[in-house]
Swiss-Prot record:
Presence of the UniProt keyword Repeat in the record: yes
Annotated InterPro entries: Ankyrin_rpt (IPR002110), Ankyrin_rpt-contain_sf (IPR036770), Asz1_SAM (IPR042650), SAM (IPR001660), SAM/pointed_sf (IPR013761)
Subcellular location(s) per record: Cytoplasm
Protein name in the entry: Ankyrin repeat, SAM and basic leucine zipper domain-containing protein 1
The species this protein was found in: Dasypus novemcinctus (Nine-banded armadillo)
Keywords: ANK repeat, Cytoplasm, Developmental protein, Differentiation, Meiosis, Phosphoprotein, Repeat, RNA-mediated gene silencing, Spermatogenesis
Major location category of this protein: cytoplasm
Taxonomy of the source species: Eukaryota, Metazoa, Chordata, Craniata, Vertebrata
CDD domains with a match to the protein in the record: SAM_ASZ1
GO BP field: cell differentiation; male meiotic nuclear division; regulatory ncRNA-mediated gene silencing; spermatogenesis; transposable element silencing
Sequence positions bearing Phosphoserine: S18, S21
Known role: Plays a central role during spermatogenesis by repressing transposable elements and preventing their mobilization, which is essential for the germline integrity. Acts via the piRNA metabolic process, which mediates the repression of transposable elements during meiosis by forming complexes composed of piRNAs and Piwi proteins and governs the methylation and subsequent repression of transposons. Its association with pi-bodies suggests a participation in the primary piRNAs metabolic process.
Residue intervals of the SAM domain: 273-335
Quaternary data: Interacts with DDX4, PIWIL1, RANBP9 and TDRD1.
Repeat (ANK) residue spans along the chain: 46-75, 79-108, 111-145, 149-178, 182-211, 215-244
Length: 476
């Protein structure tokens, strides 16, 4: 066979499911154009080898020539992969289009590994993957068919960090809250991998952030376990007012809106045009940043996105340093960080200064103040009458049970703080009564001040007494 073979490559099954051998029968290299003219004279086995090389190099004209010579569009190569599956695995859009136009089966699967799943986990840019996925969906590929591990295409797209692909899959009917064999949803996979933009998109599309894995973990807890603390804090915020917004639209309206948003290549962060900005306007007004409203609306930046922006994203979106400082200061006030046990003062080892312990108590008190303010705000905003609630709520019993747990925890906290106060008072009393206690500089300074004051008062009194005595003596 007249082919100058370069590197030998491994075509990896979509979703990270590797094959059983290091050689899958694919040769990645360059074809001698002279050999292409002899395709009509090649035996079937050599035609298949030439066909594989043409697919590997993306030589569309040779692929079409081989198909015209009678080679099957659904040829089965080693491990059962078809030409379309391989083209999808490398996100070759033009090759996928040619094969589909020639009659390739978009719904083919090999051991439940579908072509759509292969495309969603392909190697390539999101733009190329998105086009491949759109082509397959337009040829009736089912977005809800799962692999052997019960992972669906939207889970693979979320795990790979492709928010636009996720949006298109959902627009074509993909279920966002399906769970795999471990109880992971698409949102859980995005949280595990730290893909913030995918999480934003999934929440807008109605993803349930309270669904738990088989070991009882929510997406926020999965994010925390994998050191994505920004996402953990973000998912721990109150419910998103836009959550499930798309589900109110018809399929045609959803596809139109999502594809319109996706086609804008100049935007790094994709947010749909249907988002509401009331919360954003209120937030900006409270900071005196009303002038930013139009800028953020033009860039389709929601409040949820704004609250999770990094400093470089602020600059990229035209937000000035002064405005950045106001937003970051507000976020710092809103943020209630979890205190890690490893960061607590080592009181038992007596390695803590008074200032450090005081700072710890002040920080704890400030966090309690934030929690009180948050609850007060919720009480103020909560509708008094049930008919004023626009969104569908779960059973009120769920809310009341959580509130009861909160009350119990607050009572426990109060009890523990009282114990801490009594302990500190006891230590203080013992310290004052300890004869071996060496007073600190502050105590010495305070004692010296008291001595000086008493001495001055005594001298003044004695002088005044002498003056009275002298005056009396002169009168006599």
């Amino acid at each position: 066979m007249a082919a100058a073979v370069g590197l030998r490559g491994l075509a990896v099954a979509g979703g990270g499911e590797s094959t059983d051998s290091e050689d899958d029968g694919w040769e990645i290299g360059y074809l001698d154009r002279a050999s292409q003219k002899l395709t009509g004279l090649l035996p079937t086995e050599e035609k298949n080898e030439t066909f594989k090389k043409a697919l590997t190099t993306g030589d569309i004209s040779l692929v079409e020539e081989l198909l015209d010579s009678g080679i099957s569009i659904d040829s089965s190569f080693r491990y059962g992969w078809t030409p379309l599956m391989y083209a999808a695995s490398v996100a070759n859009v033009e090759l996928v289009r040619v094969l589909l136009d020639r009659g390739a089966n978009a719904s083919f699967d090999k051991d439940k590994q579908t072509i759509l799943i292969t495309a969603c986990s392909a190697r390539g840019s999101e733009e190329q993957i998105l086009k491949c996925v759109e082509l397959l969906l337009s040829r009736n590929a089912d977005p809800n068919v799962a692999c052997r591990r019960l992972m669906t295409p939207v889970m693979y797209a979320a795990r790979a960090g492709h928010p636009q692909v996720v949006a298109v899959l959902v627009a074509y009917g993909a279920e966002v809250n399906t769970q795999d064999e471990n109880g992971y949803t698409a949102l859980t996979w995005a949280a595990r991998q730290g893909h913030k933009n995918v999480i934003l998109k999934l929440l807008e599309l109605g993803a349930d952030k309270m669904l738990q894995t088989k070991d009882g973990k929510t997406p926020s807890e999965i994010a925390k376990r994998n050191k994505h603390l920004e996402i953990f804090n973000f998912l721990s915020l109150s419910l998103n007012p836009l959550e499930g917004k798309l589900q109110q639209l018809t399929k045609e309206e959803t596809i139109c809106k999502l594809l319109t948003t996706v086609s804008d290549k100049e935007k790094d962060h994709i947010f749909s045009s249907y988002a509401a900005f009331e919360d954003l306007e209120i937030f900006l007004h409270g900071l005196g940043l009303e002038h930013m409203t139009d800028l953020l609306k033009e860039r389709d930046i929601t409040l949820r996105h704004l609250l999770t922006m990094r400093k470089d994203e602020f600059t990229k979106n035209g937000i000035t340093s002064r405005d950045q400082q106001k937003i970051l200061a507000a976020l710092k006030e809103l943020e209630v960080e979890e205190i890690k046990f490893g960061e607590l003062p080592e009181v038992a080892k007596l390695e803590i200064s008074g200032d450090e312990f005081l700072n710890f108590l002040l920080k704890l008190n400030k966090q309690c103040g934030h929690l009180i303010t948050a609850v007060q705000n919720i009480i103020t905003e909560l509708p008094v009458n049930s008919h004023k609630i626009v969104l569908e709520w779960a059973s009120p019993q769920n809310f009341t049970s959580v509130c009861e747990e909160l009350v119990s925890n607050v009572e426990d906290l109060s009890e523990e703080v009282c114990k801490l106060k009594d302990l500190i008072q006891k230590l203080q009393n013992e310290r004052e009564n300890d004869p071996t206690h060496i007073p600190s500089m502050d105590e010495v300074s305070s004692w010296n001040n008291r001595i000086l004051k008493r001495t001055a008062f005594t001298v003044c009194g004695f002088g005044f007494l002498l003056f009275i005595c002298k005056l009396t003596f002169q009168r006599k």
